[in-house]
Curated annotation (Swiss-Prot):
It is an enzyme of class 7 (translocase). This is NAD(P)H-quinone oxidoreductase subunit 2, chloroplastic. One of its GO terms (molecular function) is quinone binding. NDH shuttles electrons from NAD(P)H:plastoquinone, via FMN and iron-sulfur (Fe-S) centers, to quinones in the photosynthetic chain and possibly in a chloroplast respiratory chain. The immediate electron acceptor for the enzyme in this species is believed to be plastoquinone. Couples the redox reaction to proton translocation, and thus conserves the redox energy in a proton gradient. It is found in: Plastid, Chloroplast thylakoid membrane. One of its GO terms (cellular component) is chloroplast thylakoid membrane. InterPro entries: NADH-Q_OxRdtase_suN/2, ND/Mrp_TM, Ndh2_N. It is a multi-pass membrane protein.
Amino acid sequence: MELSDILASFHASNLIPEGIVACTILLVLLLDLVYSRTCHAWLAWVAMAGLSLASVLLGQQWYQLMNLPTATMTFGGSFQADSLSLVFRAIIAMSCVLCILLSIDYVESTGTAPSEFLVLIATASLGGMLVAGSNDLLMMFVSLETLGLASYLLTGYMKRDVRSNEASLKYLLVGAASSGLFLYGISWMYGISGGHMELNSIAHAIVSLDETKTTTCALALVLMTVGVGFKVAAAPFHQWTPDVYQGSPTPVVAFLSVGSKAAGFILAVRMCTTLFPSFNTEWHLIFTILSILSMIVGNFIAVTQTSLKRMLGYSSVGQAGVMMIGMLTDSPDGYASLIVYLLIYLFMNLGAFACVILFGLRTGTDQIQDYSGLLARDPFLALCLSLCLLSLGGIPPLAGFFGKMYLFLAAWDAGQYSLVWVGLITSVVSIYYYLSVVKIMLVPATQEMSLAVREYPRRAWSLEPIQPLEVGIFVCVLGSILVGVAGNSMVNLMTITMSQAPSLGV
């Protein structure tokens, strides 16, 4: 076989988007080395351009795959570029683009070098994209650790901030423990399967195991679920979430809440549908428990929080439980609803964090009571934050309502009645704490303004001067509205996409 034939057999073109992200990382490092401080103003735009190009190419690959099915296995089966992976890789890349846009003003205000932040967040995005397509145990673990290590460094980006250092240490310790358990689980699967690395090969090898080895496989499933639960911030593996969310730089928290969560969910889907299809009952039971626990713990504890970042942290735990409902339906409709809700969540959650960043830059606080009377000082910020929070709560006619509706309908059709009822009840609880923040912001009485808002610079409705952060807020709010309006069409499109994903087997 000639070299050209060998290279063609790798189907390396499927990894061009990841190659572009890697080249973008190297370009940012090179520009910072050559031009130093003179390039700081436009380094972020270079990084966003590279990640945006990767997103566009992923969209093009998805379109080609839908119209003309091609080989999706890359590098000897270690990477699978099927329709499922293409969608999740695009979501992770888009979340990174938006997080960089939201971070420009924040990083500038700290006086730190933007190149470090950009390289780390792009590396985390690259790791997440590789997780989305990983099809063997080695690729899965290395990609997951690429995402994890970059995330640990991002949480400690503010080196002189004690809270940031504390958050980074907690995240590192809990992450290392969960990674160790995950690695222990995949090592068991490697041994039991007779030395296979590819997920499909392992799945075929464990179908006809004796009772002892079947029990070992079930234990491996539990161990690997711990690693997944950590990534998606699901209860009871959520203990790191509130402290890391409160102590880390807010743009980093925004990425962890969407990009890392998306990578965790595609990992869970790959693990359950490709690696453990013969343990369908077991993984359904495990993730049903995680879903119910996450929705109850996340939403009820969020009610008691006084910090908006901590509240959003516990909210993300509850949202993880809601997203698991889509996975537990084990149908194209359910997976499609999960993807559409994740896309809606991307915009509304990043929009909420963008508003927190902007308010924090102008006041230096993230306490909920300090938002009191914000409408009188900054109507744009108050309105945008209100829309994002109400959408997260699932208030109609906002996008979050339609996202949850599609998930609950798919679950109801699949017979998951208990999950739907728990989801509905905890959604009502979430509406309470989201509305409490909105009420605080919209009180008209001047005497009820917090000290932070009284000293807040009055902002008029104008386009000049407009900051990148304000552009990001507008994009997130607009994105959540548009996805909500086109929700039914997107669910239908994603249902067709998921039905063509061979790894799902649905």
